[in-house]
């Protein structure tokens, strides 16, 4: 068996079994992506108006006091023109006067929780989570093999074969190859990042930054939001202060005596990865613990910071959510084509004999 025949066997047979899991992941991914798109398109009749530092300080003080369970307060931007307090699975939208405009909870969306965990672990707990991760890694390998196999026969295919003209196996097969080629790169990224999200130990350390004792940061007034935000903004005057986060409180865990807040910035309004620049500050002491821009991270840190955003579009533009949702739709279609052609050529052919 030569290399090409071996890769065809791997792509066909291993791909057939992986397809059964990937169809579940992709169809639920389309649903989750669609929900995210709808959320991001809602403006709640708010017009974007940048807040002053005084308004941001008032918002933080008020919202963290009124909603202690919330872990993040986000300020209006050109992309989301409203104030938002958020924690996992829930967010509250406010107008500029800090009046509640809307409450959004994932649990209120029909079937969201079920489909999310079906996407994450096939509703099978840790076993399903790791099964999903390895299926995603094998899916990434199958994608690379598919690119190689296309390269071997690239001269025999035409752009017009992308859309099948009938339901014959040959037409579906050619469409599978062409469509697969077009989405191969983003599909590979989705598969690989899905694997890495489960195996965080492979990359999480690259995100951790150690405070540099050689850098002396300006001090702020203890327990004074306005003074501390002013200090942080003066450190990066050309950046936009967009969010404040605190560590999420875990049920049953003792509350920390001192909270270090993460003050997050966008380097410019059109930045690809939002909230990527961060200053960590002790609110009680007014002392900056660390300050790190995404552009100052080593290459490993820059790559690691994109692992989750590339998979679920966290802090990424709306256009990226649309892209990966569309990729999931196309991938679902080509996997269905592959199931039909594989069944016809393998099992139906044997039954005729």
State where each predicted segment sits.
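Conserved histidines in hydrophobic membrane contexts and catalytic metal-binding motifs
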Residues: 1-353
């Amino acid at each position: 068996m030569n290399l090409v025949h071996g890769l065809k066997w791997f792509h066909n047979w291993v791909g057939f079994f992986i397809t059964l899991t990937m169809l579940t992941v992709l169809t639920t991914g389309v649903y989750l992506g669609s929900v995210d798109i709808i959320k991001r398109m809602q403006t709640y009749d708010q017009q974007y108006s940048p807040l002053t530092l005084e308004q941001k300080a008032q918002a933080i003080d008020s919202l963290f006091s009124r909603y202690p369970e919330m872990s993040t307060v986000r300020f209006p931007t050109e992309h989301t023109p409203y104030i938002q307090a958020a924690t996992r699975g829930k967010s509250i939208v406010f107008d500029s006067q800090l009046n509640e405009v809307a409450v959004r909870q994932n649990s209120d969306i029909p079937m969201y929780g079920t489909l999310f965990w079906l996407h994450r672990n096939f509703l099978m707990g840790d076993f399903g989570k790791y099964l999903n991760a390895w299926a995603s890694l094998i899916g990434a390998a199958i994608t690379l093999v598919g690119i190689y196999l296309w390269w071997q026969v690239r001269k025999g295919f035409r752009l017009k074969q992308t859309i099948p003209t009938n339901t014959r196996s040959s037409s579906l097969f050619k469409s599978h190859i062409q469509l697969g080629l077009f989405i191969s790169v983003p599909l590979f990224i989705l598969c690989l990042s899905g694997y890495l999200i489960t195996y965080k130990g492979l990359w999480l350390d690259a995100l951790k930054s150690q405070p540099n004792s050689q850098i002396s940061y300006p001090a702020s007034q203890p327990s004074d939001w306005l003074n501390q935000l002013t200090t942080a903004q003066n450190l990066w005057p050309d950046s936009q202060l967009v969010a404040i986060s605190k560590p999420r409180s875990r049920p049953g865990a003792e509350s920390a005596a001192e909270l270090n807040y993460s003050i997050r910035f966008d380097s410019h309004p059109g930045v690809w990865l939002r909230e990527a620049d961060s200053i960590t500050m002790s609110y009680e002491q007014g002392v900056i613990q660390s300050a790190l821009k995404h552009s100052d991270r080593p290459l490993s840190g820059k790559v690691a910071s994109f692992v989750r955003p590339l998979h679920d579009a966290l802090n990424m533009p709306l256009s990226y959510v649309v892209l990966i949702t569309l990729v999931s739709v196309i991938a679902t279609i080509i996997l269905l084509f592959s199931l039909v052609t594989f069944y016809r050529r393998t099992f139906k052919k044997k039954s005729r004999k």
